[in-house]
Amino acid sequence: MTPPASPGVLYIVSAPSGAGKTSLVKALLKSDPAIRLSVSHTTRAPRPGESDGRDYHFVARDTFEKMLADGEFLEHAEVYGNFYGTSRGRIGQELDAGRDLLLEIDWQGAEQVKRHFPQSTSIFILPPTFSALRTRLTGRGQDSPEIIERRLAAAAHDVAHAEAFDYIIVNDDFDHALQDLVAITRSIRLEAQRQLKRHAALFGEFRRI
């Protein structure tokens, strides 16, 4: 008889806009195929290089509002006038089957998910300095000066909630920050209770001696 799978890990990664969260998450997923990205729904327009179903499920506002009214979202939030939400979908089923999932959401969403999945692992990404964040946002060339100022003000509010997370990574060097992110995922997998379930047959051999 096949032993029950060890439950998957739900990782929550949050950061202020411009901290490098998306790039770090993409690099992590590339280095560790065992972790799957849970794709969120959003009403905002796709950015250059983004595609529907890979980066986000891009939907119209009325579609999002209907899904929200039908209770289809595990968490949702409004950011800069756009809505974001994580579909309940198969998250529970995926975790029960032993698959690791990653949610790339803001602190408000992280708070909601933690209430439903208290065993999830939350990670907050910090920029090295406030001025570095301003430089990154300006360098993207995507927003007007007014929008950048709004993002910087929101960043200060986001960072005020960092203490609620399990881990905090300062992205002052991309490679080092990625190493820190990978180290967290590896350490979670090596927790004793997870290893006991994952290698139940091995421990069983020694108990029979």
UniProtKB/Swiss-Prot annotation:
Keyword Oxidoreductase among UniProt keywords: no
Root EC class: transferase
Superkingdom, natural source: Bacteria
Main location: cytoplasm
Record-linked InterPro entries: GK/Ca_channel_bsu, Guanylate_kin-like_dom, Guanylate_kinase, Guanylate_kinase_CS, P-loop_NTPase
Residues of the Guanylate kinase-like domain: 8-186
EC code(s) of this entry: 2.7.4.8
A Pfam entry, by short name: Guanylate_kin
Cellular localization per UniProt: Cytoplasm
List of residues binding ATP: 15-22
Record's GO cellular component terms: cytosol
MF terms in GO: ATP binding; guanylate kinase activity
Keyword tags: ATP-binding, Cytoplasm, Kinase, Nucleotide-binding, Transferase
UniProt keyword annotation of Cell membrane present: no
Catalytic activity: GMP + ATP = GDP + ADP
Similarity-based family: Belongs to the guanylate kinase family.
HAMAP family: Guanylate_kinase
Stated role: Essential for recycling GMP and indirectly, cGMP.
Protein name, per record: Guanylate kinase
